[in-house]
């Protein structure tokens, strides 16, 4: 599998607006875009060739809401950009690595994403993302 870079670090937050304001006012990170995916509202803030992704759950059934309620706000996952997510998932399956997503699904900015089960990674949630050409990072 070819990992191109750390695409983003995701942080689960209680208030997206408060967190965006903090990142902007404290670190000078601009908001590139906000997006709603299912029961999660997210914001992408560029840092060099990577992003900070802020995630706020939008209801009690949201995985982010459950995470924040159980563990509090904080680091949620790391995302690696890969060239070919289908090949990456096939390679992981061949190595016996347990996946949360057997097939890619659509995530932030239209990226094809999949998560590895944290039980296989030392309890770190890892996302793989294949970015479309029109994606924010692909046009940078």
Question: Language-model segments: what does each one mean?
Answer:
Residues 5-7, 26-32, 36-39, 59-76, ...:
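A cross-kingdom feature marking solvent-exposed beta-strand/loop segments within repeated
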Residues 10-14, 53-56, 66, 79-83, ...:
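A structural feature that tracks compact, well-ordered secondary-structure segments
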Residues 48-52, 59-61, 85:
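Short, charged/polar surface micro-motifs in flexible loops or helix N-caps
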């Amino acid at each position: 599998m070819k990992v191109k870079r750390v695409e983003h670090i995701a942080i689960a937050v209680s208030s997206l607006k408060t967190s965006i304001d903090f990142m902007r006012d404290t670190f000078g990170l601009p908001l590139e875009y906000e997006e709603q995916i299912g029961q999660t509202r997210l914001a992408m803030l560029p840092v060099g060739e990577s992003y900070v992704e802020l995630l706020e759950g939008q209801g009690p059934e949201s995985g982010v809401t459950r995470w924040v309620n159980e563990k509090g706000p904080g680091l949620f996952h790391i995302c690696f950009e890969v060239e070919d997510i289908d090949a990456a998932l096939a390679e992981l399956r061949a190595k016996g690595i347990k996946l949360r997503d057997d097939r890619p699904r659509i995530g932030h900015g239209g990226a094809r994403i999949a998560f590895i089960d944290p039980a296989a990674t030392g309890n770190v949630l890892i996302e793989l993302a294949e970015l479309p050409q029109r994606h924010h990072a692909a046009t940078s």
